[in-house]
Amino acid sequence: GVIELTKMIVQEMGKNALTSYSL
């Protein structure tokens, strides 16, 4: 569903954000 897809996108964005901040 859309909600599940949105959650996946948010998680991916979160991972990218954490990686950027770590660098």
Swiss-Prot record:
Primary localisation category: secreted
Subcellular location: Secreted
Membrane-spanning intervals of the chain: none
Distribution of this protein across tissues and organs: Expressed by the venom gland.
Keyword Glycoprotein: no
Keywords (A to Z) from UniProt: Disulfide bond, Secreted, Toxin
PTM (free text): Contains 7 disulfide bonds.
Domain of life, source organism: Eukaryota
Protein name stated in the entry: Basic phospholipase A2 homolog
Species whose genome carries this gene: Trimeresurus stejnegeri
